[in-house]
Amino acid sequence: MASEDFRCILCGGTDRPHLVQEQVTGDASGKLRAVQCLACAHVQLSPPAYDLGLYQEDGQVGFVIGHYGTPIETVFEHSAIEARRRVARFAEHGEALVRSDGQPARLLDIGGGYGFFGSAMTRLRPDVESCVLEPSASRAETGTRHFEERGDPDFPVPRFEVGLLDEDYVARHRRSYDAVTLWHVLEHVDDPLALMARAAALLRPGGSLWIEVPNLHDELFGLSPAYRRRSYMHEHISYFSAEMLERMARRLFAGADVEVTGYQRYGIFNYFHWIEHNAPQGARPDMWERDRWWLETSWRSAREAARTSDALLLVVRPVGAQGSQT
């Protein structure tokens, strides 16, 4: 790769990068490479091509269904599990989502997909006004239809707004929300710093920004070559470490309270399957709900504490919640 072909999406460096992985899952062109910037150590795809149409047409989930054989019903089931866990995480991290002026707290879930998190918030935190901002009308319609057909009071239809978090949206909603969430969104965009800054600009004073991403230092990378190969995929432009997430947040938000913790999404049986068979579980990967409680929680807690889990959670509480300092 010639140096003129590379530009780091975080620091702008153009020196020849270090090759991390030559093949990228789902790359039909064969031209994408996973590389590491030698100036700032960020790992990204090169060239960092963002395809909005992929998400508007629900191509990401379509690939999972077609490539791994995972039924859409399982995607929905796992999304519901993740949503409940994420709602619980506010209390775990000391976020009450209660305003001092007596008005309902407001939450915006950016890139909320089918709306499972928005639905869980509506059901479990009816005192909070929650909205899902989703760029794909197709996904919002699919989610709405799923909740309506399900007819389950535990899964109400969330409030959707179809659109992008662009400068126009920020101008209309600046300082309007008490919490903004991006669950596995940041890795998909070609300017993650700008997206973080726009998201923070929506926060009221005292508000908080919640970002979850896959973990570059997932320990399973070193235990299953197939898992490592699969984890570099064409829709994920960036691959973040805990250290990089913290550096990004401190660069954007001087004086902010910044917390980066590990979070384990998939269960121990999925972990063992990758190690033993060097392959995914396929149609029903283990998400772990209530079985194997002691074993699962002990293993999960250890990975999260070491930040070698499969995901990372960044929580930022900017000073004055005014957004970017750059």
Language-model regions, residue ranges each:
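Conserved N-terminal segment of class I S-adenosyl-L-methionine
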Residues: 1-183, 193-196, 261-263, 282-313, ...
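Hydrophobic/aromatic residues located in beta-strands of well-ordered beta-sheets
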Residues: 130, 209-211
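Feature marks short, surface-exposed loop/turn motifs that line or immediately flank catalytic pockets
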Residues: 139, 217-219, 266-267
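Short catalytic micro-motifs in class I SAM-dependent methyltransferases
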Residues: 183-190, 235
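Short N-terminal helix/helix-N-cap motif within the alpha/beta-hydrolase-1
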Residues: 190-194, 221
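A short glycine-rich, Lys/Arg-flanked "PGG" loop and its adjoining helix->strand segment in the class I
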Residues: 193-208
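Short, glycine-/aromatic-enriched active-site segment of Class I SAM-dependent methyltransferases
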Residues: 211-238, 243-248, 273-278
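Substrate-binding/catalytic lobe of Class I Rossmann-like enzymes that use SAM or dcSAM, i.e.
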Residues: 243-277
